[in-house]
């Protein structure tokens, strides 16, 4: 099979060639350590601060409020654990949703072991949180609410502005994991009343190894890494300048091209969804029909296993997934799909297709041509035809 089609952009994206070019000088010519006082160090320091400005501009933040990390997992850990530990005298209660990324869920479990109380909010059948449920969950001693902006699994976009307004009114910090939405749809941390926000480079055509945590000025947060005091003392470690420069370039590109990319991907996504539902009996859309990321299509099929579909598609040159690559080694049903009310067998029969800015209509057409026979053959093998 020579044809190779990539429908797994939510797992990771290829690096934009413009990003690669921006990074190159910082491997050999401009290789300094940002903490050094000499020319090479100051050259790197300047690149760092210019990068901070570019990342901040994408979400209407102040440059000083951007803390660079090595991954979204690190940023999410810093947000939850850092805020909880810094504010434990004020209270020991946090609120998260039932559809968070595994690194948020695991951080919350760790905090429970340290004596913190965690409230997990349920979602409706589309994966949406009711902001009023957030209001009800906040109580005396609540220090943080963390709700994912857009689901990495089903693409549903949460009413972040409404949740942020409630948290601000109640005097509680509000964090959102915006890894999937950052660079794809507009975000304004001020209008949305966001206090902390997680973003990742490799989900938006930047390199792996760079991410950020927006921390609004005045938020009390403790570092998890101690050492040289880099990143305003919140993230000690030698700064990975090439990756951060690449991340910043990806942000600048996204700022210019976001609207066009969203429109193009949304059109192809809609064609894909309509084509599947029309051509494959016993197929259904998971998540919200309209209030979802422009590049996400999560579908389920009666009588087949999602992993079997992936293997068969891969043999035909199509790369897809059943969900987060960070937890794909686990055989349990996807927790997000269970949270929206699917039964175990329905969750196991789901397929996530995520498009990117280089996805072509011809690739959608090829997928729609191949899929019906794949599903039919798998159902025949399983005796569900």
Regions found by a protein language model. Give the residues of each.
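Pyridoxal 5′-phosphate
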Residues: 1-385
């Amino acid at each position: 099979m020579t044809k190779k089609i990539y429908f797994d952009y939510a797992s990771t994206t290829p690096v934009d060639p413009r990003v690669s070019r921006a990074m190159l000088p910082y491997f050999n010519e401009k290789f300094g350590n940002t903490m050094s006082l000499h020319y090479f160090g100051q050259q790197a320091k300047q690149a760092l601060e210019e990068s901070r400005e570019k990342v901040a501009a994408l979400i209407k933040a102040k440059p000083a409020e951007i803390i660079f990390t090595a991954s979204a997992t690190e940023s999410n850990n810093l947000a939850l654990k850092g805020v909880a530990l810094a504010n434990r005298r004020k209270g020991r209660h946090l609120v998260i949703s039932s559809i968070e990324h595994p690194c948020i869920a695991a951080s919350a479990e760790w905090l429970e072991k340290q004596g913190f109380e965690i409230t997990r909010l349920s979602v409706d059948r589309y994966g949406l949180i009711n902001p009023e449920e957030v209001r009800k969950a906040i109580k005396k001693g609540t220090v943080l609410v963390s709700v994912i902006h857009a689901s990495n699994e089903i693409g549903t976009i949460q009413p972040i502005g409404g949740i942020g307004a409630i948290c601000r009114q109640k005097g509680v910090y509000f964090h959102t994991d915006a890894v999937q939405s950052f660079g794809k749809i507009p975000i304004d941390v001020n209008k949305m009343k966001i206090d902390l926000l997680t973003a990742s480079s490799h989900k938006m055509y930047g390199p792996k190894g760079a991410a950020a945590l927006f921390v609004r000025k005045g938020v009390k947060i403790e570092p998890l890494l101690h050492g040289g005091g880099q990143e305003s003392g919140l993230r000690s470690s030698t700064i990975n300048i090439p990756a951060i420069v690449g991340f910043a370039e990806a942000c600048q590109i996204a700022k210019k091209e976001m609207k066009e990319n969203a429109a193009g991907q949304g059109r192809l996504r809609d064609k894909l969804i309509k084509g599947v539902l029309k051509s494959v009996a016993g197929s259904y859309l998971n998540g919200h029909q309209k209030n979802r990321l422009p590049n996400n299509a999560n579908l389920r099929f009666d009588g087949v296993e999602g992993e079997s579909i992936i293997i068969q598609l891969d043999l035909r040159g199509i790369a897809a997934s059943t969900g987060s690559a960070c937890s794909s080694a686990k055989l349990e049903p996807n927790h997000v799909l269970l949270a929206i009310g699917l039964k175990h067998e329905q969750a196991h029969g789901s397929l996530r297709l995520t498009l990117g800015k280089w996805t072509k209509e011809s690739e959608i057409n090829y997928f729609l041509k191949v899929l019906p026979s794949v599903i039919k053959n798998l159902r025949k093998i399983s005796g569900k035809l």
